[in-house]
Amino acid sequence: MAFLSKFGNILKQTTNKQLNAQVSLSSPSLFQAIRCMSSSKLFIGGMAYSMDEDSLREAFTKYGEVVDTRVILDRETGRSRGFGFVTFTSSEAASSAIQALDGRDLHGRVVKVNYANDRTSGGGFGGGGYGGGGGGYGGSGGYGGGAGGYGGSGGYGGGAGGYGGNSGGGYGGNAAGGYGGSGAGGYGGDATGHGGAGGGYGSSGGFGSSGNTYGEGSSASAGAVGDYNGSSGYGSANTYGSSNGGFAGDSQFGGSPVGNSSQFGGDNTQFTAGGQFGGEDQFGSMEKSETKMEDGPIGGEFEDVAKRA
C-alpha cells in the first residue's frame, strides 16, 4: 500500500511538470494574440456628433476589414459623446487607418485616431485619452483627472498643487501653501495661513484668536490682558470700572478709596464718621455733652465756687 501511494505521488508530480511546460510554451503565442487584438482596436476622438456606427464603419472600411464599430453615447440624452472605437482584423489595417486619418477632417471635424488601450493603462481611451487614468481629458494627468490635469490632483481643482486642489499649493486646497488651504502657509489655512489655527488672520496667532492677537482672551490682545475688556484693560481688574487701579475699582471712585475706608461716608476719617463732623469727637458727640447749656457755667460747678468764696 505504501509503495502504491508513493508511486501515485511521483506520477502526479510528473504530470504537473509536463502541464506547466506546455502552458509556458503556449504563453508567448497567447500574449501575442492579445497584443495583436489590442493593436487592431482604435480610439477615435473629436468625432462629429452626427456620426453613428454605420458612418464610422464606412469611413474606416477603406483601410481594412472592420470587425466592430462603437460610438459612445450619453446615458441620459442618448446622443453621441464625440468619440468611439473601431476594431480591425489586423494590426496592419489599424496602423494604416491611423496614418491616414489622425489629425484629419472627418465629417467636418478634426479627429484624433490612436490605438485603444485598457482603461487602467496609459495612452488611449481611459489611459492617456478622454476620461482616462493619466494625461487625458478627465484622466489622472488630464482635465478633471487625478494628477496634473484640469481638476486632477496636480491640475485645476485637483488634489495636489492644482487650482482648488485638496493637497498642497493649490488655490483653495486644504493642505499647505494653497490659497484657503487647511494646512500651513495658505490663506485661511490651519497653520500659518490667514484664518487658520496658528499665525494667520483669525487664527490662534491672528486676529480674533486665542493668543497674542486682537479680540482674544490671552496676552497682548485686544480684549486680553492689557486691552479693552481684558484683565488689565478697560473694564478689567486694574482699569476703569475694575477692582484695582481703575475708576469704580477698589482704589477708585465708588471703590475702597472713595466711599470706603478713606473716603466720603467711610468709617474713620470721613464726614459723619468717627473723628469728623457728627462723629465721636465732633458736635453732638458723647464726650462734649457735659459742656452744653444744660450743664453750662450758670448753675454748674462755677456757682459752687462763688458761694464758697
From Swiss-Prot:
RRM domain segment(s): 40-118
Subcellular location: Mitochondrion
Transmembrane segments: none
InterPro entries the record matches: Nucleotide-bd_a/b_plait_sf, RBD_domain_sf, RRM2_NsCP33-like, RRM_dom, SLIRP/GR-RBP-like
Expression triggers: Up-regulated by cold stress.
One BP annotation, GO: response to cold
Biased composition (Polar residues): 258-273
One Gene Ontology cellular component annotation held by this UniProt entry: mitochondrion
Transit peptide segment: 1-37
Phenotype upon gene inactivation: No visible phenotype under normal growth conditions, but mutant plants exhibit severe editing defects in mitochondrial transcripts.
Region named Disordered: 247-309
Pfam families xref list: RRM_1
Keywords, sorted A to Z: Mitochondrion, mRNA processing, RNA-binding, Transit peptide
Molecular function (Gene Ontology), one example: ATP binding
Primary localization class, coarse: mitochondrion
SMART domains: RRM (SM00360)
Subunit field text: Homodimer. Interacts with ORRM2 and MORF8/RIP1. Interacts with RBG5/ORRM4. Binds to RBG2/ORRM5.
Family statement drawn from the similarity comment of this UniProt entry: Belongs to the GR-RBP family.
Function, as annotated: Possibly has a role in RNA transcription or processing during stress. Involved in C-to-U editing of mitochondrial RNA. Functions as a minor mitochondrial editing factor. Controls 6 percent of the mitochondrial editing sites.
PANTHER family per UniProt: HETEROGENEOUS NUCLEAR RIBONUCLEOPROTEIN 87F-RELATED
UniProt-recorded name of the protein: Glycine-rich RNA-binding protein 3, mitochondrial
Species: Arabidopsis thaliana
Encoding gene, per UniProt annotation: RBG3
